Amino acid sequence: MDSSKEPEPTGEFKCQLCGLTAPYTYYGQKPPNTHSIVILEDSYVMKDPFTPDKEKFLILGSLCSLCRRAVCVGAECSLFYTKRFCLPCVNENLQAFPLEIQEDMDKRKPQSKCLTRKKKDSRT
């Protein structure tokens, strides 16, 4: 019997903002086959499909610490500042975040508008 069998997916992670879906093999802070790694938040994790190394993994996402919706770690969907926050919650509570985060969010706004405009233009 082969003891190096791939872990079976536990379920499917789906970002409630962008719709990203991927099978995850673990949810928590200490992924299997990792010796000294502890993630700072409960996360949806999958084995890294790009390497045979069992200790390598990808963090797909987590739950927003305010609204509890599942969000991916993509910069368009969430940010981590002591905890995971979805961008809608960050924007709703922007004044509660440090100035550095507020400035970072201001920088993100023009980019997202450009992306939206490009998507609309590509349809016509």
From Swiss-Prot:
It comes from the Eukaryota. Residues 115-124 have a biased composition (Basic residues). Signal peptide: none annotated. Residues 105-124 are annotated as: Disordered. InterPro entries: CDPF1, CDPF1_dom. Belongs to the CDPF1 family. This is Cysteine-rich DPF motif domain-containing protein 1. It comes from Gallus gallus (Chicken). The gene is CDPF1.
